[in-house]
Amino acid sequence: MDVKIDILTLFPEMFHVFNYSIIGRAIEKNILSINTFNIRNFTENKHRKVDDYPYGGGSGMIMTAQPIVDCINSVKTQNKGNVVYLGPRGKIFDQSMAKKLSSEKELIFLCGHYEGIDERVYRYIDLEISIGDFIVTGGEMACIPIVDSICRMIPGVLSSTESYTEESFYNGVLEYPQYTRPEFFRGDRVPEVLISGHHENIRKWRRAKSFILTKNKRPDLFERIELSKEDRELIKLYENGYTD
């Protein structure tokens, strides 16, 4: 097994999605393993209760420390990876973080629920990640796309390295426009350069369109790009209506 990912959750059935498609095939090939552990199984009370009212009052319930910490400690006996908590205090997840985490051989993800976790659990957490400044039902909803993004970059998961190096965000830009057959669809034609067979012109077109899309749709990303002289010339050329 190349990579081991363990997920601590109250809802393990939500992660059955990883049994399908690209990630499912990678698991079948033993390129990686994704295991879930039900935090509720580590409770010490007869009702298997994992939450309680917050000290000081307030709305909602808080996940108690004991079952979470005992679950972490149990998993740690077979997985020495960092504990990653999906929570609002964390750094916003992006492609650069996905690249970094995909190089880890072992990872443990902790999914919170309700109004959050007891503060004392944080001393057992190595990294906190957020998917954005909005509210979701639980950490599971954040964990699924994060794990999927990481797994796609593990060698052998995709058919070729090129499959992910040309995708949006991998190099900090949006992916160029894509087309497939038919060549003509209700008056709309595939750009001629893509059916020309001229590989260098196709490369330039794709690169220019990638930058222009990023500039127009995600100016925040575009501002961070270090453009070469060729890049600036290509952008100017295609923005002025040039076609190959």
From Swiss-Prot:
It holds the Pfam family tRNA_m1G_MT. CDD domains: TrmD-like. It comes from the Bacteria. S-adenosyl-L-methionine binds at residues 112, 131-136. Keywords: Cytoplasm, Methyltransferase, S-adenosyl-L-methionine, Transferase, tRNA processing. Its main location: cytoplasm. The keyword tRNA processing applies. Its EC number is 2.1.1.228. InterPro entries: Alpha/beta_knot_MTases, tRNA_m1G_MeTrfase_C_sf, tRNA_m1G_MeTrfase_TrmD, tRNA_m1G_MTases_N, tRNA_MeTrfase_TRMD/TRM10. Belongs to the RNA methyltransferase TrmD family. Specifically methylates guanosine-37 in various tRNAs. This is tRNA (guanine-N(1)-)-methyltransferase. It comes from Clostridium kluyveri (strain ATCC 8527 / DSM 555 / NBRC 12016 / NCIMB 10680 / K1).
